Amino acid sequence: MQELVPNQGDAWKFMLEQMDGVFDNLSRKKIKIDKLPNVDLFKRLKINEIPPEIIDWVGLSLFLRVQTLALRTAEMHIALGSDIHETAFTPTTYNGDYTVWLKNRLLYQFQNRLNIIENSLHKLDGMALDLAHQFLENKKLIRKHFVDFDWTKMKSERIRIHGDFHLGQVLVNGDDFYLLDFEGEPESTIRDRKVKQPPLKDVAGMFRSFHYAIYATIFNNADKYPFEQEELFKAGELLFKYLVGAFLETYIEKAQSGNLNIGYSHEINFLLK
């Protein structure tokens, strides 16, 4: 039995509704996508550092909600990494054993995805086919990126994490959020789910969920927004970078103030990538 949490649905549904409004604003407010200011991915952004043109387009309220989600995410990680007595939850450093486990797992998952794509090429066309070929052309580079991981350069710590963190694992409660479903990745073994990992893996999972929500909105409303698909993609990527920046600023500030060792800027960016 679990306690009932009063809620207005999950954050995935909430974000889709928000994204629809944001893309609708492009035409409603006659926004010129090419004129919107750009920003680097993973650049931390306080609210007052977000250009007024972006605030006018996206709306202040969405950035404030993203900040709240970031705060709750950091609080979750601080709680999971604060037990110094129970060894199953004590923070730990990177080591050779973890690196072997990580590389084997990544390469196994990568090969599975590779096989799926190779066996599905005949079903694809258009942009999906182009992206599939692009992925296959870069498979050696991707594999090398995994193999070259060097744990000796990592200064942050690993903890028990959520493990399957995305918008669907979050309930909306007024202006706040509840995080739930801590059982980890469904496709992972119980043993693998217990492996301590960088908390930024959860953060990256949430960012991927932001990205999915943006593109689900574009693809599911193709006839609604009076723009070429490429223009919507450009707006979507820009929106993604600003949401990520607002999330990171709040998350990193709270995590570091709670003595959660997530590393310095270079390591944070490396792990997120």
Model-derived features: where do they sit?
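Amphipathic alpha-helical protein-interaction segments enriched in hydrophobic
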Residues: 266-273
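An alpha-helical support segment within catalytic cores of ATP-dependent transferases
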Residues: 113-159
